[in-house]
Amino acid sequence: MGRAEQKADVLVKDQSPGDVKNEVSSRPEDAHSFRLLSAEDKHGFMLLVLLYMLQGIPVGLAFGTMPFLLKSYVGYSQLGIFMLSTYPYSLKLLWSPIVDSLFVSAWRIPCTKLELSLGRRKSWIVPIQLIVGITFLVISYQIDALLENAETSIYLITLVFFGLIVLAATQDIAVDGWALTLLSEENVGFASTAQTIGINVGYFMSFTVFLALNSVEACNKYLRFRPQSTPILTFPAYLQLCAAA
């Protein structure tokens, strides 16, 4: 056996299983790609993106839009009171065991013979979306008055958005758990990608995009041929749009 062959044999023997695994996984044909997912996993991925996007809308409102709007009406101390409404999103670990353990397998629609199949995750997601939609619709008729009288209504505004963030955090727990079974085992890593895309799109839509469409100056400068005195999208109209979604 030549010296070169002996050296190659020693190198092969010195390789650890991890080295071999890394070498194999680095091959282009073994890399995971969205276009290589099965149709079922693609549908699951898109559903996760949609659910995370809906979750990102109230998060963007509470963390971005409302503080931006409130600073024109209240001082820093009252703005700090409102920011208490964002705390539940960081404390969702406290009630995540409840979300994982309590659920309804099926729900019979009153006055009908129809039965809605829910399960462990949809038992939380479906009611949460209904409550969030109704809340958006109700406050859309009062939000302008609440902002104009923010100094006296700051606690009510904080309470409303505290509830919305609790619901968003609870949905996050349910969707995270559902992602583990919605995608196949070898593609479950795409759940984090869906979460990143969905939440950021929802946050961006309810913060940056909304504020741009709500600004008369921005609308007249970038989006209109003729200046007008009203924005393209008012806050009540945006909340009603979110409620419909």
What spans do the regions from the language model cover?
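Helix-loop boundary and gating motifs at the non-cytosolic
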Residues: 26-89
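Hydrophobic core of transmembrane alpha-helices in multi-pass small-molecule transporters
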Residues: 53, 128-174
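Intracellular juxtamembrane helix-capping segments at the cytosolic ends
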Residues: 66, 166-183
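Loop-to-transmembrane helix entry/capping segments in MFS-fold secondary transporters
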Residues: 76-79, 180-195
